[in-house]
């Protein structure tokens, strides 16, 4: 009963472990799906980052052109003033320079906002990529641990089966030895009864007491006979 109880308890344990293994497997699959989803979103963010970098470059180039245009007009306006050119023309140039300055101010603000967004996106993309890489590494560790534990569980199951077989064999051997001992005792008792029946048991008892002759030769008898022959 003890062995059966132990096996029953162990069986319940294995069932519980199997249920936990199923839950862990499902958990691993869910984590893998989350990682795939995160990588897909990261790819989208990467494409948005490329678009943002392109907009930053376009804004930077536009600002450069505006500044170069403003500098060129300022130089020509100074030259016009030095040559006493028609004031209306100089005023027209001044108005264009003022318009360019307003455009430059607005574009500088646009570029600043774009650069802030770019820096934030780059940090987020880098951090997310690092986290995904860490999760993937941890996932490999989880898979390796799960495989190792499954192997250990298989070994444990085999060991329990072997222990049960050994216990059964030991009990069978003990029963066999007991039956053989009982059989030998019955044979010895039968032989003793046979000796009593034909008188051999009594003769053996008298011989042990030194009464009566014995047809058996002993080493002492042989040695005494040889000594007598030598004296003759």
From Swiss-Prot:
This is Uncharacterized protein YjfJ. InterPro entries: PspA_VIPP1 (IPR007157). Keywords: Signal. Transmembrane segments: none annotated. Residues 207-232 are annotated as: Disordered. Belongs to the PspA/Vipp/IM30 family. Residues 1-18 form the signal peptide. It comes from Escherichia coli (strain K12). The gene is yjfJ. GO terms for molecular function: identical protein binding. The lineage of its organism: Bacteria, Pseudomonadati, Pseudomonadota, Gammaproteobacteria, Enterobacterales.
């Amino acid at each position: 009963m003890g062995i059966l109880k132990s096996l029953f308890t162990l069986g319940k344990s294995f069932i519980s472990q199997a249920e936990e293994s199923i839950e862990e497997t499902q958990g691993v699959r869910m984590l893998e799906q989350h990682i795939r989803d995160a990588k897909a979103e990261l790819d989208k963010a990467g494409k948005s980052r490329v678009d943002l970098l392109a907009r930053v470059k376009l804004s930077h180039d536009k600002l450069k052109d505006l500044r170069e245009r403003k500098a060129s007009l300022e130089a020509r306006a100074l030259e016009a003033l030095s040559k006493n050119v028609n004031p209306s023309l100089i005023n027209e140039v001044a108005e264009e320079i003022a318009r360019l300055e307003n455009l430059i101010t607005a574009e500088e603000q646009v570029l600043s906002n774009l650069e802030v967004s770019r820096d934030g996106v780059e940090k987020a993309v880098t951090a997310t990529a690092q986290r995904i890489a860490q999760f993937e590494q941890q996932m490999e560790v989880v898979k390796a641990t799960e495989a190792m534990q499954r192997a250990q569980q298989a070994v444990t199951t085999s060991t329990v089966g072997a222990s049960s077989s050994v216990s059964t064999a030991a009990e069978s051997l003990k029963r066999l030895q007991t039956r053989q001992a009982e059989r030998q005792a019955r044979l010895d008792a039968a032989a003793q009864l046979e000796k009593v029946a034909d008188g051999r048991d009594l003769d053996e008892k008298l011989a042990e007491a030194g009464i009566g002759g014995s047809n058996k030769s002993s080493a002492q008898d042989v040695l005494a006979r040889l000594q007598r022959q030598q004296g003759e």
